[in-house]
Regions:
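Short amphipathic alpha-helical "interface-anchor" segments enriched in bulky aromatics
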Residues: 388-415
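Short, basic/hydrophobic alpha-helical segments
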Residues: 218-235
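Acidic, metal-coordinating catalytic cores used for nucleic-acid/nucleotide bond scission
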Residues: 239-248, 266-269, 420-423
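Basic, amphipathic alpha-helical segments enriched in Lys/Arg and hydrophobic/aromatic residues
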Residues: 418-439
Length: 500
């Protein structure tokens, strides 16, 4: 079998096709033909362009970047025997995932076989890879993966943000799918819950877990606090939304020597506590003004014990939100009043604002408007007021993670029916989000997001050329744009060599 060998002559590097032959009991190389030479690290063919044919053009740029990020944190080694198939699914979820049965044809349009060993890829192999994920000890595996990320990126996380989302399933026979509170407010869909913890600064995922669709948000954190305790992180701040807060969660996190910063629902007890301070004219004084990004809050801070845990409670007034909520309700009430005058039915829930004859009741309306625009947050650490607000209200990094999971990585809708395949599908999406978050971190000093960078690299193809006359094959990456060079440099300058 022939191959290409380099020869140095007079300071230049030449390429020749040679083949091994056995002569006199020894293996010797026989010159077949001159191929070309190297100049500035590039191959210059001796053949005429008229003899060259384009054999194939493959998608290369996004996959090169994703595979580089995965290899840096030793993801292929950690995934074991089915790593090649699993990584192909992960990369597809980042770029252009549709379904398992579409994967073999999608693979043919990409240069994944240059990066992964996927010769003869079939849907059956991919299903086998999904099954292998279910055999993993997911909790221990996620911890080891995160430890590897911290080592490579030299991270010492001091803040964690936790949140829960749900997604629906097409199939109705999966035991995980249960009726629950759909965060998209669509009724009648079977749901699963996904809890996700990310680092507060970088947005790197620490852990995730899939729950039945009818599990309360606060209960999901109860299950995951024990897992979080095994990570051995130095004490920091655990941040989560008001739907997750509970006395047990506060105490469990405190036992780990971590502090809590969380939202708290404004129930009747808290309304009674805050009523002496909730007068907008009293609260909206200049010393109480705090800016968080484009939003203005007026705040009041008081010591408080929440389920026996000491901390400080902040009442936050968003005057703009108060005005919008109040005017939206009044529009609905006035429209309902006109419908009642015509003897027509009104929107459920608005009846309490009218008497039996359809006359408006000012008392219930004023009561409903009393705490419009107010929110409440609780913190067990003594933070400056502005920092307390910015840390809580700027926690959209986990919301961006969920948008990435649901949008870019195609978390929803889940088309699998078997519970183990649902777990595996979410796990694939979790790994895809991990790579996207690593990419976003590497691009933090550029104008690009992870999604826009992958889109820009989508025109970075590899062309396979064949010399029809001498049956010589060569691959070349198409010329890079300026933006593509910026992206590759931001990730790793060594990737620029991959274009040669």
């Amino acid at each position: 079998m022939s191959f290409i060998r380099k020869f140095k002559r007079g300071g230049r590097v030449y390429l020749a096709e040679v083949e091994n032959r056995r002569a006199g009991g020894k293996v010797v190389q026989r010159f077949v033909r001159y191929v070309g030479k190297e100049a500035d690290g590039r191959t210059i063919l001796s053949a005429s362009l008229s003899d060259a044919e384009v054999e194939a053009v493959k998608l290369y740029g996004p996959l090169l970047v994703l595979h580089h990020l995965a290899t840096e944190i030793q993801l292929p080694e950690q995934l074991g025997d089915h790593s090649q198939e699993i990584l192909s699914l992960v990369y597809a979820h980042c770029v252009d995932y549709r379904s398992l049965n579409y994967m073999p044809s999608w693979f043919e349009r990409t240069d994944l076989n240059f990066l992964l060993d996927l010769e003869g890829l079939t849907e059956r192999r991919l299903v086998g890879a999904l099954n292998s994920l279910e055999a993993l000890d997911a909790e221990a595996w996620q911890r080891r993966l995160f430890e590897g990320v911290c080592r490579h990126y030299r991270l010492r996380p001091s803040g964690v943000i936790y949140d829960v989302t749900n997604t629906y399933l097409y199939g109705r026979h999966c035991p995980l799918a249960k009726p629950g509170h759909d965060k998209d407010e669509v009724k009648g869909r079977p749901l699963i819950q996904v809890g996700l913890g990310v680092t507060q600064k970088e947005g790197f995922p620490l852990f995730h877990k899939v729950f039945d669709g009818n599990v309360h948000d606060a209960r999901t954190l109860q299950d995951l606090v024990t897992l979080f305790g095994t990570y051995g992180l130095r004490p920091g701040l655990f941040i989560y939304d008001r739907g997750i807060v509970s006395g047990r969660n506060l105490k469990d996190i405190k036992r780990l020597h971590w502090d809590t910063l969380c939202g708290v629902p404004l129930n009747e007890g808290l309304k009674k506590f805050w009523r002496p301070y909730a007068d907008p004219h009293q609260l909206m004084q200049l010393p109480n003004r705090q800016r968080v990004g484009p939003t203005i809050f007026y705040t009041c801070l008081r010591p408080y014990q929440l389920d026996g845990v000491r901390g400080r409670l902040a009442l936050c007034l968003n005057e703009r939100h108060q005005r919008e909520a109040r005017e939206a309700r009044r529009d609905e009430v006035l429209y309902a009043q006109s419908l009642l005058a015509q003897g027509k039915s009104i929107k459920p829930g608005l009846e309490r604002f009218f008497d039996a004859r359809g006359h408006l009741l000012p008392g219930p309306l004023a009561q409903a408007e009393e705490f419009d625009g107010y929110s409440c947050i609780f913190c067990t650490r003594r933070l400056p007021e502005d920092q307390m607000l910015s840390l809580y209200f700027d926690k959209d990094i986990v919301e961006k993670a969920f948008r990435s999971l649901k949008g870019v990585t195609q978390l929803r809708p889940v088309r699998h029916w078997l519970a183990e395949h649902v777990h595996a599908h979410v796990f694939i999406c979790y790994l895809a989000y991990l790579l996207l978050s690593l990419l976003q971190y590497r691009l933090r000093h550029t104008e690009f997001t992870a999604e826009s960078a992958l889109l820009e690299l989508g025109t970075m193809y590899k062309a396979y050329l064949r010399d029809a006359k001498h049956v010589f094959k060569l691959s070349r990456v198409v010329a890079l744009t300026k933006k593509q060079e910026i992206i590759l440099k931001a990730i790793d300058r060594r990737l620029l060599r991959s274009k040669d």
